[in-house]
A protein has these predicted regions:
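Acidic/polar loop patches that form or flank catalytic/metal-binding clefts of enzymes
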Residues: 33-34, 114-120, 175-181
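Generic recognition of flexible, low-complexity loop/linker segments
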Residues: 40-42, 64-68, 105-107, 218-222, ...
Length: 255
């Protein structure tokens, strides 16, 4: 897969082709795909020669596949991300649940008309600061759980969605009769009280090394793909500062 939903963000075929060429140079020989939102603007921006266009969506299968047909040049139709649930964001009021009957109908239609990759087949866990976030009108960070209302739960429990999807698959492919024997015990560990604490500022020299720069450096510039960056700056001026503008300061800023 070359990039992911890049057509939502930019129109830059030279970049996408460069990514494809790098993969080829390093020995990738399997067929290439692009993975886009099935809308004409994003497909026009994200599709390139030599890669099968696929779509990411969770409903309206016929409508989405009809758009894909205009870009696949007779090739196979593929839903690369069939969204069977959604993220849990902090403050969204509880665990997100999809409509099972609609999921089953769309899954059936996808197998009838084309191909599908289930997202997610099994839920996962966002460890540490790897939770990520959506950012449309405002920042909406994900919680630790990435259960996603998936076909199998975060801890591997078999769901009704699993059973219903299995029935759909059996319409198109013979499935062996396998006894489902998972018996996963769950346990509540109660309430854990935190008694000790330490300030971040008192431990900085032990957990990190400073980087000095005239300009603010991004995570990419610093070779960092995880966690946070703590920025410090001293404004040398004898005049009173009445207004400071901070762009996209999503966490904390002390002045």
């Amino acid at each position: 897969q070359i990039e992911n939903e890049y057509g939502y963000f930019a129109t830059d075929s030279s970049y996408l082709n460069a990514m494809k060429n790098i993969m080829t140079e390093y020995g990738i020989t399997v067929p290439f795909i692009t993975s886009e939102g099935p809308y004409r603007d994003s497909m026009n921006a994200g599709c390139i020669e030599g890669a099968l266009p696929t779509g990411n969506f969770g409903s309206k299968t016929e409508e989405r596949f009809e758009i894909l047909k205009d870009y696949t040049n007779g090739g196979p139709l593929m839903c690369a991300e069939f969204w069977v649930g959604w993220f849990d964001h902090w403050g969204n009021g509880g665990h997100m649940k999809s409509n099972l009957e609609e999921n089953v109908q769309d899954f059936d239609r996808m197998l009838e008309l084309g191909n599908v990759n289930i997202y997610m087949f099994q839920g996962g866990t966002n460890f540490g600061f790897m939770n990520g976030s959506n950012y449309y009108d405002e920042l909406t960070p994900d919680v630790t759980s990435y259960d996603y209302d998936a076909v199998l739960t975060e801890d591997g429990q078999i769901t009704e969605k699993y059973r219903r999807f299995r029935e759909v698959i059996a319409k198109y492919k013979e499935i062996p009769d396998v006894k489902l024997s998972m018996d996963i015990k769950r346990k509540s560990y109660g309430r854990l009280e935190i008694k000790d604490k330490v300030s971040l500022s008192s431990t900085l020299d032990k957990i990190s090394k400073p980087v000095f720069s005239v300009y603010t450096q991004s995570m990419e510039k610093l070779g960092q793909n995880y966690g946070y960056i703590l920025y410090h700056s001293t404004l040398d001026t004898e005049e009173n500062i009445e207004r400071i503008k901070l762009w996209k300061a999503n966490d904390r800023a002390n002045i």
